[in-house]
């Protein structure tokens, strides 16, 4: 074969490995790159390529260096014949077809994600504007997703479509007058002079100002139901009346755009919802694709670049941190965070006089564990560089780069990436050694992304029976080498890879590239097994297995062994980390798991607003679900250190508790579990020998007991009464392991002084008192909370934090009535002087139980308390005065006659026992009390 034919074949092979996105990125091939692949001199290859161009078999670009593409392969890719004028082009991208976009005057195109995650939202917004006379719109989504910005885009789009006057956009935040319906009416609809006190002149409302345009009602959920109903006439008929006007209503042409962060069903009237024709839900930032998140970050950095008139430079770790940072405020919070990062960098570099603002990982608050997709796209974006420089021209080029990384849809990501990346690097004149180093760094990320992408989990299409049988035999060979069967989530991507490999080899798309340095260090022990499997591929699939397949097989075999290790690593022994903070435990566990290359640690985060009981409930559910028979529990501070004995008693298992955990001790435990022992007594001794604090909790250990401290600033007398109420209500639960201690308020403010009141083996369960003493992580119940609806439940959470939700509900039913009785007794003792308080209270409880059962009532604790106190005092009043309350009753058309009759019947035993008669007025008051 002549040299020119070899060059033509290589050019065709390389061109067929391209896609349209590559052409958009100006990807083509130089004489040097082709010469490197074939081992030929650059000048000889250049001569042959120019001859091929003269013969019409290749096209080339003008400029230096000169790029070439195979003409027929390019026409196949484009799906059209090239014109004669296109034999030589200014740039490779010139041969691409013109893409269809929205008209350039469409404001929605400035919205990142308008053609992807926000496509449905944009189409709904455009439809609402374009429909004759427009449609009303409800925008929903969490805070900070850009609802106001979306409404402004709708208005700008309406302005572009308007043939006459520009429609106005009037903004109103419904929270401003949420609690004053009259001022709300005046502000929205206007008022006439004299409509109310202080209305000295006519006022135009926002509705009239928005006539012919849009009224944006932000935070519409803050409107009361009455406020929502005031808008019905506009929504239904396009009419309204200013405040104080009773004449003919005024016609109006206004479209409402309502925005809310709350669930629509709970915040808005159903009758209000159905009057709004279009509902648009905007997703949170972490529901957007990774490429959109990167575009948002770069867009905000580009905005700061224009503001400060400098290039902004960011490194890879900081960009990954921004992608993984928890953002409760979504896009709005991201914008503020980026502004703050730029301000920090500006302040730290004020003494330096350069044109670049440097942002780097030192500004990040914590380490992150990025996903393979994030690493892939960020690697694609940085193109092997250490930093990304952002200025006014960055975003358009970035979108093309991200599209290349995100749209890889070929049947096998590994080889499609390898081919494309290799070609790009060689065309960039990167030396061979550096090319291998760059590829090696990226292969692990691309492998993980391809293996665990959602597309890989789905069932791939089936091929001919003969090929399927051979691929199945190959999978069996892999399982034989590994020594265990593969789960379906690994079989599917393996099968898909083998089927794709056949096509790539037959089309000659795999570059003749191989070096042992491409195999990651952690995978080199799988080299012999991978080589054996390559021979099996040659034998079963009848193809020449490329040397690069050894690299993929090494990665796959190592991942399978890690998977097996995660499954087999003491499945009966859980290792759980709990730490204060929204993501502290998760971040630390992910970091250590990545270092150890196994999923060893599970994490439970404890945000600031989460209670100790809720955290314990999460822990117990995790243990129940995973059926652990042993547990290693790692915690940081506070009440979490008591979870060890609680879990040990609750599940009757051994628990190794490690308090005051740090990242260093986490790594130490992980290494010991991986390479030393998972036996808890042996592990305890090993850790203690390294001076790492730990404690082995067993079910047989005696519980040291709990102490509940009661303290009132009003004096010891009040504290004694509270103690008495709690003993009568929850005495059975306290048994021998809980005691109550009364302390002066000044003593409670110091944790050291509180500890002095405890025995060495006791722990502080919580504090009940007047004011919050401010002790860190010590549960506190105020008197207001104690006597509220949630009072008994709060006390139960202190005394029995290890109860399940079902057990807690059962105990609540038992204790709630005793709690109410105890409170009622304390109250009626102060008001009853003639009757026996215990007797009358017991009788009234019987009446109350009869009423709730007969009338199917579920009254609140407040209603129960009021009923018992009122009825006990009522009976004593009638006994002393010898006559009931006498008052004229108005006609009550809504009175439930049956319920009224049941109430009368229930009090007959009381009337007989105390020789009294209750009037209808007394019964009516009791009726109102129960049904209020």
Swiss-Prot record:
GO molecular function, one term: DNA binding
Domain (PRD): residue spans on this chain: 462-567, 835-932
Reported consequences of knocking out the gene: Cells lacking this gene are unable to grow with D-glucosaminate as the sole carbon source.
UniProt source species: Salmonella typhimurium (strain 14028s / SGSC 2262)
Protein's recorded name: Transcriptional regulatory protein DagR
Free-text comment on this protein's domains from its UniProt entry: The PTS EIIA type-4 domain may serve a regulatory function, through its phosphorylation activity.
GO cellular component: membrane
The protein's role, per its UniProt record: Involved in the regulation of the catabolism of D-glucosaminate.
InterPro entries according to UniProt: AAA+_ATPase (IPR003593), P-loop_NTPase (IPR027417), PRD (IPR011608), PRD_sf (IPR036634), PTS_EIIA_man-typ (IPR004701), PTS_EIIA_man-typ_sf (IPR036662), Sigma_54_int (IPR002078)
Ranges for domain PTS EIIA type-4: 572-708
């Amino acid at each position: 074969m002549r040299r020119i034919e070899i060059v033509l074949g290589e050019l065709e092979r390389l061109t067929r490995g391209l896609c349209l996105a590559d052409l958009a990125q100006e990807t083509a091939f130089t004489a040097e790159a082709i010469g490197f692949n074939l081992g030929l001199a650059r000048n000889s290859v250049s001569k042959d390529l120019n001859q091929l161009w003269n013969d019409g078999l290749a096209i080339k670009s003008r400029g230096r260096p000169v790029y070439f593409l195979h003409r027929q392969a390019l026409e196949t890719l484009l799906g059209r014949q090239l014109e004669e004028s296109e034999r030589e082009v200014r740039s490779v991208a010139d041969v691409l077809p013109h893409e269809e976009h929205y008209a350039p005057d469409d404001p929605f195109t400035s919205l990142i994600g308008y053609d992807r995650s926000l496509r449905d939202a944009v189409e709904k917004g455009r439809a609402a504007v374009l429909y004759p006379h427009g449609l009303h719109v409800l925008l929903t989504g969490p805070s900070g997703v850009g609802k106001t910005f979306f409404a402004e885009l709708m208005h700008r789009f309406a302005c572009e479509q308007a043939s006459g006057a520009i429609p106005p956009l009037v903004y109103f935040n419904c929270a401003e007058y949420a609690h004053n319906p009259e001022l709300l009416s005046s502000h929205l609809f206007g008022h006439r002079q004299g409509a109310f006190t202080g209305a000295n002149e006519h006022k135009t409302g926002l509705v009239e100002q928005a006539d012919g345009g849009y009224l944006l009602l932000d935070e519409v959920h803050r409107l009361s139901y009455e406020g929502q109903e005031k808008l019905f006439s506009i929504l239904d008929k396009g009419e309204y009346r200013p405040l104080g006007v009773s004449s003919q209503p005024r016609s109006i042409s206004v479209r409402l755009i309502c925005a809310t962060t709350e669930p629509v069903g709970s915040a808005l009237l159903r009758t209000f919802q159905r009057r709004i024709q279009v509902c648009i839900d905007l997703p949170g930032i972490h529901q957007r694709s990774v490429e959109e998140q990167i575009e948002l970050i770069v867009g905000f950095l580009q905005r700061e670049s224009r503001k400060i008139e400098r290039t902004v430079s960011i490194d890879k770790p900081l960009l990954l941190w921004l992608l993984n940072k928890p953002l409760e405020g979504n896009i709005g919070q991201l914008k503020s965070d980026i502004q703050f990062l730029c301000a920090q960098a500006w302040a730290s570099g004020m003494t330096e006089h350069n044109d670049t603002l440097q942002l780097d990982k030192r500004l990040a608050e914590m380490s992150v564990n990025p996903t393979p997709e994030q690493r892939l796209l960020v690697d694609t974006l940085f193109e092997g560089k250490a930093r990304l420089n952002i200025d006014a021209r960055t975003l358009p080029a970035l979108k093309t780069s991200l599209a290349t990384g995100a749209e890889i849809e070929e049947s096998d990501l590994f080889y499609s990436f390898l081919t494309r990346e290799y070609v790009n690097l060689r065309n960039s004149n990167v030396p061979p050694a550096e090319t291998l180093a760059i590829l090696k760094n990226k292969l692990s990320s691309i492998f993980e992304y391809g293996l665990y992408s959602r597309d890989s989990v789905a069932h791939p299409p089936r091929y001919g029976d003969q090929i399927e049988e051979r691929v199945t035999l190959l999978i069996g060979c892999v399982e034989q080498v590994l020594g265990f069967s593969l789960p379906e989530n690994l079989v599917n991507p393996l099968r898909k890879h083998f089927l794709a490999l056949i096509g790539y080899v037959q089309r000659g798309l795999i570059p003749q590239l191989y070096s042992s340095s491409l195999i990651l260090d952690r995978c080199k022990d799988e080299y012999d097994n991978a080589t054996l499997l390559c021979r099996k591929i040659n034998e079963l699939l009848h193809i020449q297995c490329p040397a690069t397949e050894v690299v993929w097989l090494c990665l796959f075999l190592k991942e399978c062994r890690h998977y097996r290790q995660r499954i087999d690593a003491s499945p009966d022994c859980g290792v759980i980390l709990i730490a204060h903070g929204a993501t502290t435990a998760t971040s630390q566990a992910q970091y250590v798991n990545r270092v150890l290359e196994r999923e060893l640690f599970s994490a439970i985060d404890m945000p600031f607003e989460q209670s100790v009981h809720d955290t314990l409930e999460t822990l117990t559910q995790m243990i129940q679900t995973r059926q652990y028979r042993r547990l290693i529990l790692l915690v940081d501070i506070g009440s979490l250190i008591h979870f060890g004995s609680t879990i040990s008693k609750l599940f009757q298992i051994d628990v190794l508790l490690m308090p005051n955990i740090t990242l260093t001790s986490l790594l130490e435990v992980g290494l010991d579990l991986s390479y030393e022992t998972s036996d808890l007594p042996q592990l305890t001794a090993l850790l203690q020998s390294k001076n790492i604090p730990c404690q082995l909790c067993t079910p047989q250990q005696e519980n040291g007991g709990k102490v509940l401290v009661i303290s009132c600033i009003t004096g010891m007398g009040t504290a004694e009464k509270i103690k008495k109420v709690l003993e009568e209500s929850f005495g059975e639960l306290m048994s021998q392991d809980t005691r109550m201690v009364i302390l002066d308020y000044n003593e409670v403010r110091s944790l050291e002084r509180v500890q002095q009141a405890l025995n060495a083996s006791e722990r502080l369960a919580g504090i009940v008192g007047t004011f919050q003493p401010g002790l860190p992580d010590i549960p506190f119940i105020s008197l207001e909370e104690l006597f509220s609806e949630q009072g008994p439940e709060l006390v139960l959470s202190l005394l029995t934090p290890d109860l399940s939700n079902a057990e807690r509900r059962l105990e609540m039913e038992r204790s709630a009535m005793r709690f109410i009785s105890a409170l009622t007794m304390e109250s009626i003792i102060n008001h009853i002087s003639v009757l026996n308080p215990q007797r009358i209270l017991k009788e009234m409880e019987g009446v109350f139980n009869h009423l709730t059962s007969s009338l199917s009532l579920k009254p609140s604790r407040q209603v129960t308390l009021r009923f018992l106190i009122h009825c006990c005092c009522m009976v004593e009043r009638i006994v002393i005065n010898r006559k009931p309350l006498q008052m004229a009753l108005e006609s009550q058309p809504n009175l439930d006659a049956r319920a009224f009759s049941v109430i009368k019947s229930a009090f007959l035993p009381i009337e007989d026992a105390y020789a009294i008669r209750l009037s209808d007025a007394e019964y009516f008051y009791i009726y109102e009390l129960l049904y209020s």
